[in-house]
Amino acid sequence: MKNVFKTLAVLLTLFSLTGCGLKGPLYFPPADKNAPPPTKKVDSQTQSTMPDKNDRATGDGPSQVNY
């Protein structure tokens, strides 16, 4: 009898936890045909991989950048 309760408890826990990973609404309404498509502004600035100056060194202390 103890094995039945343990098995049912494990199954109930597993079934209840499977819903935890689901995200978003359970019902997806039809898309609005009159709505404009979503746009996102793209920032085209590129960042160099080598820093211009290392601000971590104080005075003649060690620096992480070879000049």
UniProtKB/Swiss-Prot annotation:
InterPro entries to which the protein is assigned, alphabetical: LptM_cons (IPR032831)
Residues with lipidation of kind S-diacylglycerol cysteine: C20
Signal peptide range: 1-19
Lipidated sites in chain (N-palmitoyl cysteine): C20
UniProt keyword Membrane present: yes
Keyword Signal on entry: yes
Any one cellular-component term (Gene Ontology): cell outer membrane
Keywords: Cell outer membrane, Lipoprotein, Membrane, Palmitate, Signal
Membrane topology annotation: Lipid-anchor
Subcellular location(s) of the protein: Cell outer membrane
UniProt region (Disordered), positions on chain: 26-67
Protein's job: Component of the lipopolysaccharide (LPS) transport (Lpt) pathway that promotes efficient assembly of the outer membrane LPS translocon (LptDE) by the BAM complex. Facilitates oxidative maturation of LptD by stabilizing a conformation of the LPS translocon in which LptD can efficiently acquire native disulfide bonds, thereby activating the LPS translocon.
Family, as annotated: Belongs to the LptM family.
Assembly description: Interacts with the outer membrane embedded portion of the LPS translocon formed by LptD and LptE (LptDE).
Name recorded for this polypeptide: LPS-assembly lipoprotein LptM
Lineage of producing organism: Bacteria, Pseudomonadati, Pseudomonadota, Gammaproteobacteria, Enterobacterales
